[in-house]
Amino acid sequence: MDKRSLYDGLNSLETDLDSSVTQLREIKAALHELVEKNTTLEIENQRLREHLQELNKLAGNTTETEKQELSKSRMNLEKLYEEGFHVCNILYGSRRENDEECAFCLDVIYGERTR
């Protein structure tokens, strides 16, 4: 390989890398915007839930769903489950394949406990 073709190949590689870095920066910026928006929406959603609960309490409506509200620990388990992880004692912490439902996990989160 002569010096000229080596130099041209190196310039081509540099151009490709610059292009890749530019694309990576654009993707990173888009991801940052999405994470920011997601966080904002989660906070707004939580505030709206709390406001709705306050309105229901003020109205004196004690519905069946309010009586069966999940505890904070079960809500944490539910969040982990929704993120794609097992929360059952059999496969705890491992990823759910293709986000398939797990009867054991659902029982841990929503099942009746009499202890």
Curated annotation (Swiss-Prot):
It comes from Enterococcus faecalis (strain ATCC 700802 / V583). Involved in control of chromosome replication initiation. Inhibits the cooperative binding of DnaA to the oriC region, thus negatively regulating initiation of chromosome replication. Inhibits the ability of DnaA-ATP to form a helix on DNA; does not disassemble preformed DnaA-DNA helices. Decreases the residence time of DnaA on the chromosome at its binding sites (oriC, replication forks and promoter-binding sites). Tethers DnaA to the replication machinery via the DNA polymerase beta sliding clamp subunit (dnaN). Its cofactor is Zn(2+). GO terms for cellular component: nucleoid. Its main location: cytoplasm. It is found in: Cytoplasm, Nucleoid. The lineage of its organism: Bacteria, Bacillati, Bacillota, Bacilli, Lactobacillales. HAMAP family: YabA. This is Replication initiation control protein YabA. Pfam families: YabA. Zn(2+) binds at H86, C88, C102, C105. Belongs to the YabA family.
